[in-house]
Amino acid sequence: MYDLLKTIDDPADLRRLDRRQLQPLADELRAFVLDSVSKTGGHLSSNLGTVELTIALHYVFNTPNDRIVWDVGHQTYPHKILTGRRDQMHSLRQQDGISGFPRRSESEYDTFGTAHSSTSISAALGMAIGSQLNGDDRFSIAVIGDGAMTAGMAFEAMNNAGVSEDAKVLVILNDNDMSISPPVGALNRHLARLMSGRFYAAARAGVERVLSVAPPVLELARKLEEHAKGMVVPATLFEEFGFNYIGPIDGHDLDSLIPTLQNIRELRGPQFLHVVTKKGQGYKLAEADPVLYHGPGKFNPAEGIKPSTTPAKKTYTQVFGEWLCDEAERDTRVVGITPAMREGSGMVEFEKRFKDRYYDVGIAEQHAVTFAGGMATEGLKPVVAIYSTFLQRAYDQLIHDVALQNLPVVFAIDRAGLVGADGATHAGAYDLAFMRCIPNMTIMAASDENECRQMLHTALQQPNPTAVRYPRGAGTGVPTVKEFTEIPLGKGEVRRQTSQPEGKRVAILAFGTMVAPSLAAAEELDATVANMRFVKPVDAALVRELAETHDYLVTVEEGCVMGGAGSACVEALMESGVIRPVLQLGLPDLFIDHGDPAKLLSQCGLDGAGIAKSIRERFLNPAADVAGQAKRVA
């Protein structure tokens, strides 16, 4: 089994094969990907769809001297297998194993780290120009999906690439007619037999946005209007960018891919190759339902993914989806917005029930936030469902277009904290710090499912921008209450009181997901625990009260310490004039790799045992007692 694949330890081995051996190799590679992912979990549909393209690229181009940048990067398992990591695939996305995305530190063939979408063309162009300036003769290749091509950054790069006439840069559009969620809007119309409608329309919109402000391109603007009316063949659009357009060709036909790439290899200047592929290619279950098989856990390939027979705890994403439907039922002003994450953000049911109030704007986080701001000015109640890591992409819009105008937009921030197998690129570690400094913002962190529901309801009542953050995955098992209860603004609650004598009284100020492990630590130490609820405005009165009645304060959050929720408590403490030693616990100043979330939190000292250990070492050992007594005497 895998007789050919076992002979490939790097692309040089691949290039020694006869052309007639490549299709059998592709069959083995596809089977190996399916077998590997079924054992570890990971991205499947996209990787089954890029097998032939990956083989062709490494066969024709002299990698790693020629650079390949994979947009998003979740489709790179065939690439990893062919570049020396075949025998490490059992560790894919596991702790201390190989990443599910390209990483420069992992292999010289991973020329640029990716995981967020639409960055590849910019990176490849930068590499091409850098190689030019260094006197190196190499190709830089960006492989980008049709969903990622809808983002503005891709068109900004295309516009820039077009003026670099001698740069050896190749953009490959992997047109598989699907991003994670089905593409939307005008981008879904077909203009030609195999030409992706959403890509063409997005290209038109992107060119207009990038170029319309420049007086010299009025003629181009007129040509764009002609494109829209179907008066000019679609390929001309790419030529207006300065690219030589080739395609579309079958992305699963090596006899088409290889000669085409060999011809392109001899050309100079920006090239654009349009290939058509199918997600899930070669595995009928994934072909039939590429969304279900986009990122499965472990499963039996012979049987496919089976529904779980054991009742699962409700996920926070499900809590959000149910809440949004309930609010929309009560109030016709409620609208839901997602940047291409309908399934991931729990909005499938909302779309079915409230289609006229559901807006999937595509991979366009910047637009999503400003779009919501515009809706708010018209009296609507927009709710933006977005992952913490993707909100980073719309930071200017959050400040300039929403907060500065104090518009009542609700941000439902999913995947806050560590996310596990997707690793550092998707960690929601920074949202508290980057939002807390923005005037007019209200920020809440949910400790359980019902609190998440009530916080979301509270957010919808606010006259200003408000964010509720919650983690990936299942909650604590707390049932949600159907009736809504508005939480008093900026007020936390004490969950547990210490019975320790003066000198040993510890108060733990916990935020969101850290309430449960803090309670576990408090049982061991007999400490007070406060569920702070609000990061902004932080409950300054509660901070002062706890400081006045305790000897030591500890803040705990599942986010970066610098500038985070703990910092808000320290600032409130300084304002109160009550001086107490404070220990701030949170995620370390590191990019935390992929792994099991519970194990990663334990390694960060953010489980019950770790929190108790940190408190003991800082405050409750003999040296701390002596220091505390000396401070009190002074």
Swiss-Prot record:
PROSITE patterns: TRANSKETOLASE_1 (PS00801), TRANSKETOLASE_2 (PS00802). GO terms for molecular function: 1-deoxy-D-xylulose-5-phosphate synthase activity; magnesium ion binding; thiamine pyrophosphate binding. Its EC number is 2.2.1.7. It comes from the Bacteria. Gene3D superfamilies: 3.40.50.920, 3.40.50.970. The gene is dxs. Belongs to the transketolase family. DXPS subfamily. Its cofactor is Mg(2+); thiamine diphosphate. Keywords: Isoprene biosynthesis, Magnesium, Metal-binding, Thiamine biosynthesis, Thiamine pyrophosphate, Transferase. Binds 1 Mg(2+) ion per subunit. GO terms for cellular component: cytosol. One of its GO terms (biological process) is terpenoid biosynthetic process. This is 1-deoxy-D-xylulose-5-phosphate synthase. Pathway: Metabolic intermediate biosynthesis; 1-deoxy-D-xylulose 5-phosphate biosynthesis; 1-deoxy-D-xylulose 5-phosphate from D-glyceraldehyde 3-phosphate and pyruvate: step 1/1. Thiamine diphosphate binds at H74, A115, H116, S117, G147, A148, N176, Y283, E365. Mg(2+) binds at D146, N176. Catalyzes the acyloin condensation reaction between C atoms 2 and 3 of pyruvate and glyceraldehyde 3-phosphate to yield 1-deoxy-D-xylulose-5-phosphate (DXP). Homodimer. It catalyses: D-glyceraldehyde 3-phosphate + pyruvate + H(+) = 1-deoxy-D-xylulose 5-phosphate + CO2. It is an enzyme of class 2 (transferase). The lineage of its organism: Bacteria, Pseudomonadati, Pseudomonadota, Betaproteobacteria, Burkholderiales. InterPro entries: Dxylulose-5-P_synthase (IPR005477), THDP-binding (IPR029061), Transketo_C/PFOR_II (IPR009014), Transketolase-like_Pyr-bd (IPR005475), Transketolase_BS (IPR020826), Transketolase_C (IPR033248), Transketolase_CS (IPR049557).
